[in-house]
Amino acid sequence: MHKLNVLAALKWYGVALLVILLDQITKNVASHMLVLHQPEPITSFFNFTLRHNFGAAFSMFHDAGGWQRWFLALLAAGVSVLLIFWIAKLPKQKWMEALALALVLGGALGNLYDRMLLGYVVDFIVVHYKEHEWPAFNIADSAICIGAALLVWDSLFGTKVAKYGDAK
């Protein structure tokens, strides 16, 4: 088992902070420049549409009556604490895993900030094809998805680290 190495993890916490900042800046701009539920076309398949998501990813639980705010906030906070420790325990060779976890951490904290401050998460990016529309999302959601994809990629193709930290 690896010891906590908070100093080595600082760069990954910096990545998470960058995600939070980009997420909050873009949400702030969207909230001030867009009208709620009114699409602003960018391309034939992409637009910005301000939405307030009271639920989870892809608007799950959006009409659950209010309990979901606290449940999802507690879940995000718990996962974030776990990720902070996980990142600090990773050996230096596991940089892709650390990057992936930092992206997930930044995304989780970006959405947690919204949920605690506003009671909902600001979404504004919409991809669509004809009448079919993907649920609205934001930079935090994108970071979480990219981080999850990197975790899968790393688990399948990444550098394996032996018990004592030697790369195989």
UniProtKB/Swiss-Prot annotation:
Principal location class: membrane
GO MF annotation terms: aspartic-type endopeptidase activity
Gene Ontology cellular-component terms listed: plasma membrane
Catalytic residues in the record: D123, D141
Keywords: Aspartyl protease, Cell inner membrane, Cell membrane, Hydrolase, Membrane, Protease, Transmembrane, Transmembrane helix
Metabolic or biological pathway, per its Swiss-Prot or TrEMBL entry: Protein modification; lipoprotein biosynthesis (signal peptide cleavage)
GO biological process: proteolysis
Membrane topology designation: Multi-pass membrane protein
Keyword Membrane attributed: yes
Transmembrane segments: 6-26, 70-90, 98-118, 139-159
EC number in record: 3.4.23.36
Annotated function: This protein specifically catalyzes the removal of signal peptides from prolipoproteins.
Name the record gives this protein: Lipoprotein signal peptidase
Gene designation per UniProt: lspA
